[in-house]
C-alpha cells in the first residue's frame, strides 16, 4: 500500500472549503480563511492540503511503530462514519458520549471494560444458570457498556495519537489528551479555536461528505502503516487470505489554486 492520495478537487466536491456564517467565526481562524461568500467564510484549501498530508503521514508513521490511533467524533453525522473508519483500519473509536476521565482515569475505565468482557463471555454462553429476567438485565448492561466503551475495548492502554472531528464538541477529550501528552490531530472549522491542537487541519466539520472523506483518508493512512509494519517483519501481504485492497482513486489532475476553483465573487477576509 501507499499513503492515501487526494486532490484539491476532491476536497472541493466534499465541501471542505465551506466554513460557518461569518458572524459565528472564531477570529483565531483568520489565517486559515481565504474570504467570504454570501456571509459564509471560505476556508483556504491551499493551506488545508499540506496540513492534511502531514497528518496522514503522522498516522501512518504512528501505526508502523505499533502505536494506537483513537478516532473521536460523537456528533450525529460523524458517529457511524467514525466507527466504520476505525474498525476497518484496526484502530479504536469513541462515537457516543465522551465519558469524563476516559483517558485520564484509565484504571477505572479498564475496570468497566473488564466488566464488558465478562458480560460478553456470560452471554456468549447463553447466560446459562440465569433467569430470563436476569439475562435481560445482563443484555441491557452489556448494551450500555458497549455503546460507551465498545470502540476502545481492545485498545489495552491510552492511545498514541488522537484524531478528532469537531474540537468544540470534543473539548473534554482534547483536554484529557493534552494532560497526558497525547498528540491531537483535528479538523478545525471556522468557529473553532486552533490553539492547543498539535496538528490542525482547516476544513468543514459538519458536512457528511467532508467527514466521510477525512475518515476514509485517515483509515487508509492507518492501513498503510499496518502494511509497512508487516512488510518490515517480512510478512507476504499477497499470501494473506485477505490481503489489503487499495481503493481505486479517480485520477483528477488539478493544476489550479483554491482561489481559481472558488467563484470570483468571494471576498477576501481581513485579518
Curated annotation (Swiss-Prot):
Annotated GO biological process: translation
InterPro entries (UniProt xref): Ribosomal_uS2, Ribosomal_uS2_bac/mit/plastid, Ribosomal_uS2_CS, Ribosomal_uS2_flav_dom_sf
One of the record's GO cellular component terms: cytosolic small ribosomal subunit
Cleaved signal peptide residues: none
Keyword Acetylation: no
Keywords: Ribonucleoprotein, Ribosomal protein
The organism's place on the tree of life at top rank: Bacteria
Gene Ontology MF: a single term: structural constituent of ribosome
Gene3D superfamilies: Glucose-6-phosphate isomerase like protein, domain 1, Helix hairpin bin
Protein family according to the UniProt entry: Belongs to the universal ribosomal protein uS2 family.
HAMAP family: Ribosomal_uS2_B
Protein name (record): Small ribosomal subunit protein uS2
Lineage of origin: Bacteria, Pseudomonadati, Pseudomonadota, Alphaproteobacteria, Hyphomicrobiales
Amino acid at each position: 500500500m501507499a499513503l492515501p492520495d487526494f486532490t484539491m478537487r476532491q476536497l472541493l466536491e466534499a465541501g471542505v472549503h465551506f466554513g460557518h456564517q461569518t458572524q459565528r467565526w472564531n477570529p483565531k481562524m483568520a489565517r486559515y480563511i481565504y474570504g467570504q461568500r454570501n456571509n459564509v467564510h471560505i476556508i483556504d484549501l491551499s493551506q488545508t492540503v499540506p496540513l492534511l498530508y502531514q497528518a496522514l503521514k503522522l498516522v501512518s508513521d504512528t501505526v508502523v511503530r505499533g502505536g494506537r490511533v483513537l478516532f473521536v467524533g460523537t456528533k450525529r453525522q460523524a458517529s457511524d462514519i467514525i466507527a466504520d473508519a476505525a474498525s476497518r483500519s484496526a484502530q479504536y473509536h469513541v462515537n457516543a458520549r465522551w465519558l469524563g476521565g476516559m483517558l485520564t482515569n484509565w484504571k477505572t475505565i479498564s475496570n468497566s471494560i473488564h466488566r464488558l468482557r465478562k458480560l460478553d463471555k456470560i452471554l456468549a454462553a447463553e447466560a446459562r444458570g440465569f433467569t430470563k429476567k436476569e439475562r435481560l438485565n445482563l443484555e441491557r448492561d452489556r448494551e450500555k457498556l458497549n455503546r460507551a466503551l465498545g470502540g476502545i475495548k481492545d485498545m489495552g492502554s491510552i492511545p498514541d495519537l488522537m484524531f478528532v472531528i469537531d474540537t468544540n464538541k470534543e473539548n473534554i477529550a482534547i483536554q484529557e489528551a493534552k494532560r497526558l501528552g497525547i498528540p491531537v490531530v483535528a479538523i478545525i472549522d471556522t468557529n473553532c479555536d486552533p490553539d492547543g491542537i498539535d496538528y490542525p487541519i482547516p476544513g468543514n466539520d459538519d458536512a457528511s461528505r467532508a467527514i466521510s472523506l477525512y475518515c476514509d483518508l485517515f483509515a487508509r493512512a492507518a492501513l498503510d502503516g499496518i502494511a509497512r509494519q508487516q512488510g518490515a517483519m517480512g510478512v507476504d501481504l499477497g499470501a494473506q487470505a485477505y490481503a489489503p485492497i487499495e481503493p481505486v482513486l479517480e485520477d483528477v489532475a488539478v493544476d489550479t489554486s483554491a482561489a481559481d476553483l472558488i467563484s470570483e465573487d468571494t471576498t477576501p477576509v481581513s485579518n
